């Protein structure tokens, strides 16, 4: 915190009201239609004023008025929010349809126009586009259908006409062809008859010759056949002999071949081994050969490279050698030529130098004559030039003056131009930024569209799949429903039989087992460590089972879970897993179970969320999540304070709840309320419809009853079960069910070998229904309370049914869907929903970027004046140029003989590498030849069979000719009938009706264009209402009027100029009477809307600009749009609140803005209104009230108004201790970024501070300190927006002079937030006047008021100075720690006897309640210090005694100091009373002592020296004990006038007195 002090003049005044606030008189502000802004609504006055305008409950110093009532127009408009009246008709172009109908009529088609089809009224342009697209598609389809029908009909007519013409032509051709065919037929019949007669004659002659030739051939052939048969018999005999001889020869040959094959097999095997060895040798050779060839190649390549390098170097060498030799020859030739030329040139130079010498002598004589004439001419020219220069300088001065003026004018114009350029650049930068934003919005719109399109395509694919699956799923569902219906009909017949639901129902909640569920917990109690739970199981009541590796939950003593180090920061799981794997539990025997543990008090809760559910369904639809809230019933009667909940990870296992502390309890109970909600796959709460929830294992013994109560839904009894319902509680209502035969129990709950039906209390027991029932539940949120209670708290005590013995206050219960009734059908199939085809997303309309503003025109700069022209100086005469004497030319040096280049060194050839040795080819083994094959024998050739003589062929029998058949005459022609004309078709068409109700949306924003609907903004904030209208649809009628009417809320100050500036395109009017603003679209705007009626058009919107001017106000607003006087709609209602409104539903932190001021003492005790001693420190505690601003959305300009805290303290009474000022936040953290300045008065403050205070209506009376946020934005973000109050502790010391005068002072503070001021309460304290008094008395009686001040005291008289201390009033602010009497008496005339006494002047009450009465002696609670040399005595109260006095008690004491008058004269005396470090002087007493010659005692010589003797006197050595005050002190004043010995040390005092007397005498 930075501290700064500023000093000024302030007129001092001390009175009963030393401080306060001078509040500016707050001008009345109209709540509607006012033409001034909030910054202008306060005035100040020079007179003190009080805080006004607390109508809102907020102590505002400016704009204090409460918000007025809403106008009738505003209320009516808001009550009708969202209502519409009329619509905008949309006409979809139907040109194509009309043309198709017209063409159809022209073509002769029967055209019928049907009634118009109403497509309804849509809300948005997008919906209109969709509908218009549907209509367009329908019109297109109608037109296409009509055109198709028309074209078909026209085609049919044309085809019919063509077909008629075709048939007629064809029939004519048929007729002509028939006549032609008949003539040809007749000619052909005549030809055929003649030809057939000639063929028959020729055939009959050939047949006679054939028969004679056939008889001769048959005879020859019979003789040839007989000869052949004879030859054949001889052939067959010879063939047999040859075949037998050949068979014998072949057998001998086959034997020889077999022997030869065997021998050759052996040879082949040997040859195979030879081949292998040869192959190995060959491979090795080829490897070496390859290596040789590679190395040979490398060597050859290297040698070739070396040779190539050598040849290249040789070529270069030869080239360079030729060049060097030529260069050297050229250089030598040039040198020799140069030598000859040099000799010739030097001879010429020698002759020329002789001529030069003569010319130089002639030039010198001529120059000296010209120089003399020049000097005379030069003097005349200089005189004329001096006159010209003076004239030029005068003109130059005038020129420079004008030039400066022109340059400044041009610079100013340039600066203005550059400022305009900068403004233009800034504006264009803003437009560029806006265009960038537009690009981003367009890109976002495109990305959003593409994302929606991708989703649509995915949804479409899913839809198509779902559409294919739907019939299958529907069939499965309907089959199951039919099966369930049949089962329920059967169960209805048996509902009164054991184990059946009395109200048969299907179980649509499948919720039996979830071993893999995930559990997460939250709690307002405490999480327990798993190690703490394990430790608790290992102790006391549960130890025995623990040692057997059994976790017996109902034996666990929960006091072992109540240590501070048992608490975990989050859920930890425990159970028979991990290092407890293999252990058993009483919950599920050897099956693994896990649970999280919490420790709760009555009324506390734990909320469990179960996920990863795999087996649970409702109506066939998967359950994804269950949320249970477990709350300890505050009415539970268990004796302890804590309940341990073991919440199982499997929600179907439920909860183990225990308040068992190791001892059974009588008349006890423990109940847990279970609130639960089930969620479907989409994360939505499931709305149960008669879902069955099992309540099972409800045991009843004669000392304990387990029950369910306070449940939603309806109880369903199971026939034969012991569980019923009574008085809203579900339990075994009529009998016990613990052991057979006891209290009417039918079976024993646990298994007994000798008892059939025992063990019903197991989930898999066939008669588990005996201890169970069901609850039929509906709705998304349900609850049931379960627990256990002593029987005597439910039914009267009874030896059988209810005995008063102790029980453990614990219970394990589970809520699941496992209904114990028999044959309950389950719903496993979800009723499939017909898939809905997704709608394709609408392609976005992209915003158009705004053009940049043109650059400003560069100014026309003034032309700078023409500088004066200097009169040219007369040319000085040309001074004759000294002659340039010719220099004799030196002779040319002899040419240098050239250095010839050395010839290059010839290159050296790199020697070739030696080629590698080529490997020797291997010597291969020779394979052995095979044995030659035996020679096959020569077999005898078989004899040649005889060849029969071929038969002579028989002659060919002549073929009887085929006579031509007489052709069939042509058929009579068949003529084609003409086709039937096509029937005339009928086409129908219809038009559509479509209307649009464009939607409107009202938005409320701050000056940073941030949405502030249903939020909080500071008073005086600029609030903008944006009146937005959706796109006007395509196909609309021309828009002739577009009017928006907005009845503004009360307390909202309308700014017409800003509104007009923010609403281009609209004419703005304002009705002050109704506080209503009306926007009418201009002609230009309407022209834009009507530019293309075939396309939708984006509307522009007006913006209402104004300020909110009330504390604790709610500003609600909507508007009405009217288009063409045919369509009207009321917008949504927006709402914004200002701070200072308690019970604000939109802003729960909102409350009154009330800075507070409290005065405390050093111990932190509030001392408002108490008496405060001078010199004490006031610890003023100022609260900067910021919590109501939490979640504020004020704009940056409002925030920049700053945050201030003003402390108007009374500088007349208090001294500021700015070095001790401390600022902390509500969390105790030190606040940084706040500076504090101190000003002696308002006039001493800078103008900035004066303006802030003036606008806030605050005028401090005098000095004040002001705290301000250095960086308003950081302060706002850190403390204001987060709603964190600040505490300022500002210590101030009560000035000492206040104790001299007394009086009251008051103190007030103010906070200024966003320019709005609020006053704190006023603190008033009173400073008592401390007025010590001094008397001179002759007695020690406090009741003796005889004062001899101003009188005569005889010499050697013993008397008393009575020192009456100042009174400390009752109810003072801080403890007394110092109350002293200091008396500087005149030791020349008075001698202190060493005796004093102290008495109470008022009743004194101590902190322990004891009282010392007025008049009681207090000497024992004091000490005295005496300096006899200086004549000073100090009597001090012990600090412990003073601090034991109650601050509610008054305090005053008086001291009596005994003196003896030892000198003659007049003596004056004053004493000082010190109270808590502040000294107060008493009145001065004066006494006179005359000479007394009869007095035998020599008076002390005033001039004699005195020895300084300091006495520290402590009348009592014991510390003050308030409790013994009544026992040791009298309750009344002391009336004895004699001085009593002071606590046994009078001898010591006397000794000091004697020493003092002795010193005087010495």
UniProtKB/Swiss-Prot annotation:
Topological relation to the membrane, as annotated: Peptidoglycan-anchor
Sequence ranges of Low complexity compositional bias: 42-54, 1500-1509
Motif (LPXTG sorting signal): 1529-1533
Signal peptide: 1-38
The protein's role, per its UniProt record: Surface protein antigen implicated in dental caries.
Family the UniProt entry places it in: Belongs to the antigen I/II family.
Protein's recorded name: Cell surface antigen I/II
Organism: Streptococcus mutans serotype c (strain ATCC 700610 / UA159)
């Amino acid at each position: 915190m930075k501290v700064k002090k500023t000093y000024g003049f302030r007129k001092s005044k001390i009175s009963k009201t030393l401080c306060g606030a001078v509040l500016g008189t707050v001008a009345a502000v109209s709540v509607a239609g006012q033409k001034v802004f909030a910054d202008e609504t306060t005035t100040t006055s020079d007179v003190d004023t009080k805080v006004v305008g607390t109508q809102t409950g907020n102590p505002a110093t400016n704009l204090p008025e409460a918000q007025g009532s809403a106008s009738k127009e505003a209320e009516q408009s808001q009550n009708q929010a969202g209502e519409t009246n009329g619509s905008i008709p949309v006409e979809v172009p139907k040109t194509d349809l009309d043309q198709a109908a017209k063409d159809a009529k022209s073509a002769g088609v029967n055209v019928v126009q049907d009634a118009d089809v109403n497509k309804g009224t849509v809300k948005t342009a997008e919906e209109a586009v969709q509908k218009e697209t549907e209509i367009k598609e329908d019109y297109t389809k109608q037109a296409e259908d009509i055109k198709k029908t028309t074209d078909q009909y026209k085609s049919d007519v044309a085809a019919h006409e063509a077909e008629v013409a075709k048939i007629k032509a064809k029939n004519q051709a048929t007729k002509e062809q028939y006549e032609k065919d008949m003539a040809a037929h007749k000619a052909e019949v005549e030809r055929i008859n003649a030809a057939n007669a000639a063929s028959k004659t020729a055939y009959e002659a050939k047949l006679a010759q054939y028969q004679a030739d056939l008889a001769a051939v048959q005879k020859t052939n019979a003789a040839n056949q007989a000869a052949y048969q004879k030859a054949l018999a001889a052939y067959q005999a010879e063939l047999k002999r040859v075949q037998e001889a050949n068979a014998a020869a072949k057998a001998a040959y086959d034997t020889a071949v077999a022997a030869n094959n065997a021998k050759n097999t052996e040879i082949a095997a040997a040859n195979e081994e030879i081949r292998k060895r040869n192959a190995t040798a060959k491979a090795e050779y080829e490897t070496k050969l390859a290596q040789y060839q590679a190395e040979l190649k490398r060597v050859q390549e290297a040698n070739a490279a070396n040779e190539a390098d050598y040849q290249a170097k040789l070529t270069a060498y030869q080239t360079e050698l030729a060049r060097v030799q030529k260069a050297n020859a050229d250089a030598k030739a040039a040198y020799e030529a140069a030598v000859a030329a040099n000799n010739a040139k030097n001879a010429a130079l020698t002759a020329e130098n002789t001529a030069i010498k003569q010319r130089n002598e002639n030039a010198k004589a001529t120059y000296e004559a010209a120089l003399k004439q020049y000097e005379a001419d030069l003097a005349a020219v200089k005189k004329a030039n001096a006159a010209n220069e003076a004239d030029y300088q005068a003109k130059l001065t005038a020129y420079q003056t004008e030039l400066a003026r022109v340059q400044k004018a041009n610079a100013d114009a340039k600066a203005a131009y550059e400022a305009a350029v900068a403004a233009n650049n800034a504006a264009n930068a803003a437009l560029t930024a806006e265009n960038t934003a537009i690009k981003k919005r367009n890109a976002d719109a495109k990305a959003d569209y593409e994302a929606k399109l991708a989703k649509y395509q995915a949804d479409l694919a899913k839809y198509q799949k779902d559409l294919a699956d739907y019939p299958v799923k529907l069939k499965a569902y309907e089959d199951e429903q039919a099966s369930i219906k049949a089962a329920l009909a059967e169960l209805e017949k048996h509902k009164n039989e054991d184990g059946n639901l009395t109200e048969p129902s299907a179980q649509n909640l499948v919720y039996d087992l979830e071993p893999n569920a995930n559990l997460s917990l939250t709690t307002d109690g405490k999480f327990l460590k798993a190690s703490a739970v394990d430790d608790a199981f290992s102790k006391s009541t549960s130890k025995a089972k623990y040692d057997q590796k059994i976790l017996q939950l109902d034996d666990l003593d929960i006091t072992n879970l109540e240590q501070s180090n048992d608490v975990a920061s989050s859920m930890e799981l425990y159970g028979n897993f991990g290092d407890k794997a293999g252990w058993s539990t009483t919950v599920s025997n050897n099956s693994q179970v896990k649970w999280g543990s919490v420790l709760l008090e009555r009324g506390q809760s734990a909320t469990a969320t179960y996920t990863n559910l795999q087996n649970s369904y409702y109506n066939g639809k998967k359950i994804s999540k269950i949320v249970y809230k477990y709350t300890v019933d505050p009415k539970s009667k268990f004796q302890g304070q804590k309940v341990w909940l073991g919440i199982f990870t499997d929600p179907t296992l439920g909860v183990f709840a225990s308040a068992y502390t190791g001892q059974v309890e009588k008349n006890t109970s423990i109940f847990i309320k279970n609130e639960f909600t089930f969620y479907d796959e989409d994360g939505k709460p499931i709305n149960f419809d008669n879902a069955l929830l099992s309540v099972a294992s409800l045991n009843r013994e004669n000392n304990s009853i387990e029950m369910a109560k306070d449940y939603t839904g309806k109880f369903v009894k199971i026939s034969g079960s012991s569980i019923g319902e009574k008085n809203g509680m579900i339990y075994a209502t009529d009998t016990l069910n613990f052991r057979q035969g006891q209290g009417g129990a039918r079976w024993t709950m646990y298994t007994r070998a000798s008892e059939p039906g025992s063990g019903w209390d197991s989930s898999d027991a066939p008669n588990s229904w005996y201890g169970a029932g069901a609850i039929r539940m509906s709705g998304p949120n349900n609850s049931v309370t379960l627990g256990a209670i002593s029987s005597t708290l439910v039914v009267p005590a009874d030896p059988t049914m209810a005995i008063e013995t102790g029980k453990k206050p614990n219970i394990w219960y589970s809520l699941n869907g496992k209904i114990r009734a028999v044959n309950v059908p389950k719903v496993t199939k979800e009723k499939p929903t017909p898939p809905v085809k997704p709608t394709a997303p609408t392609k976005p309309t992209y915003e158009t970027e705004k053009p940049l503003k043109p650059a400003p025109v560069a100014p026309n700069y003034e032309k700078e004046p023409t500088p004066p022209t200097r009169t040219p100086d007369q040319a000085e005469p040309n001074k004759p140029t000294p002659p340039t004497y010719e220099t004799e030319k030196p002779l040319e040096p002899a040419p240098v003989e050239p250095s010839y280049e050395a010839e290059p060194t010839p290159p050296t050839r790199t020697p070739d590498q030696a080629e590698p040795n080529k490997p020797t080819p291997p010597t291969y083994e020779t394979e052995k030849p095979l044995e030659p094959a035996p020679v096959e024998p020569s077999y005898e050739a078989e004899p040649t069979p005889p060849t029969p003589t071929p038969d002579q062929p028989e002659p060919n029998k002549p073929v009887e000719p085929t006579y031509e058949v007489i052709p069939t005459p042509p058929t009579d022609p068949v003529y084609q009938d003409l086709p039937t004309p096509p029937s005339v078709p009928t086409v129908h068409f219809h038009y559509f009706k479509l209307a649009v109700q464009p939607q409107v949306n009202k938005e409320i924003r701050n000056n940073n264009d941030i949405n502030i609907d249903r939020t909080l903004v500071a008073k005086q904030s600029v609030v903008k209402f944006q009146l937005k209208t959706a796109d006007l649809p395509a196909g609309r009628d021309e828009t002739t009027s577009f009017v928006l009417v907005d009845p503004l809320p009360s307390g909202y100050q309308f700014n017409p100029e800003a509104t007009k500036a923010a609403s281009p395109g609209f004419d703005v009017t304002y009705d002050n009477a109704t506080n209503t603003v009306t926007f009418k679209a201009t002609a230009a705007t309407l022209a834009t809307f009507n530019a293309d009626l075939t396309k939708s058009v984006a509307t522009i919107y007006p913006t209402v600009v104004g300020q909110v001017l009330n504390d604790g106000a709610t500003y609600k607003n909507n508007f009405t749009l009217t288009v063409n006087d045919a369509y009207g709609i009321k917008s949504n209602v927006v709402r914004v609140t200002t701070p200072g409104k308690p019970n604000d539903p939109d802003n729960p932190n909102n409350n009154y803005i009330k800075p507070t001021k409290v005065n405390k003492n050093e111990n932190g005790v509030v001392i408002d209104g108490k008496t405060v001693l001078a010199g004490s420190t006031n610890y003023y505690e100022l609260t900067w009230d910021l919590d109501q601003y939490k979640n504020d959305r004020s704009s940056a300009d409002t925030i920049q108004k700053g945050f201030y805290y003003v402390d108007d303290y009374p500088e007349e009474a208090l001294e500021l201790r700015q070095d001790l000022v401390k600022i902390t936040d509500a969390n105790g953290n030190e606040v940084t970024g706040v500076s504090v300045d101190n000003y002696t008065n308002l006039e001493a403050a800078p103008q900035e501070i004066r303006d802030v205070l003036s606008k806030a209506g605050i005028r401090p009376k005098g000095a004040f300190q002001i705290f301000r946020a250095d960086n308003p934005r950081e302060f706002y973000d850190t403390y204001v927006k987060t709603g964190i109050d600040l505490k300022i502790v500002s210590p101030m010391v009560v000035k000492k002079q206040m104790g001299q005068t007394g009086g009251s002072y008051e103190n007030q503070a103010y906070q200024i937030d966003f320019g709005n001021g609020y006053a704190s309460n006023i603190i008033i304290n009173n400073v008592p006047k401390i007025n010590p008094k001094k008397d001179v008395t002759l007695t020690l009686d406090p009741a003796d008021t005889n004062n001899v001040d101003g009188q005569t005291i005889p010499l050697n008289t013993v008397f008393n100075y009575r020192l009456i201390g100042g009174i400390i009033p009752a109810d003072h602010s801080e403890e007394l720690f110092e109350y002293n009497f200091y008396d500087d008496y005149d030791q020349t005339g008075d001698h202190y006897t060493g005796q004093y006494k102290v008495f109470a002047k008022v009743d004194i009450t101590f902190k322990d309640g004891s009282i010392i009465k007025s008049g009681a002696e207090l000497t024992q609670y004091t000490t005295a210090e005496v300096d006899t040399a200086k004549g000073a005595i100090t009597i001090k109260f012990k600090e412990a005694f003073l601090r034991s006095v109650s601050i509610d008690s008054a305090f005053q004491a008086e001291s009596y100091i005994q003196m003896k008058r030892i000198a003659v004269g007049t003596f004056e005396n004053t004493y000082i009373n010190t109270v808590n470090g502040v000294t107060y002087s008493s009145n001065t007493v004066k006494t006179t002592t005359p000479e007394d010659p009869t007095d035998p005692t020599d008076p002390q010589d005033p001039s004699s020296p005195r020895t300084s003797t300091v006495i520290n006197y402590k009348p009592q050595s014991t510390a003050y004990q308030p409790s013994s005050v009544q026992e040791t002190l009298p309750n009344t004043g002391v009336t004895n006038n004699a001085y009593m010995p002071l606590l046994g040390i009078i001898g010591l005092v006397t000794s000091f007195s004697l020493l003092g007397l002795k010193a005087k005498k010495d």
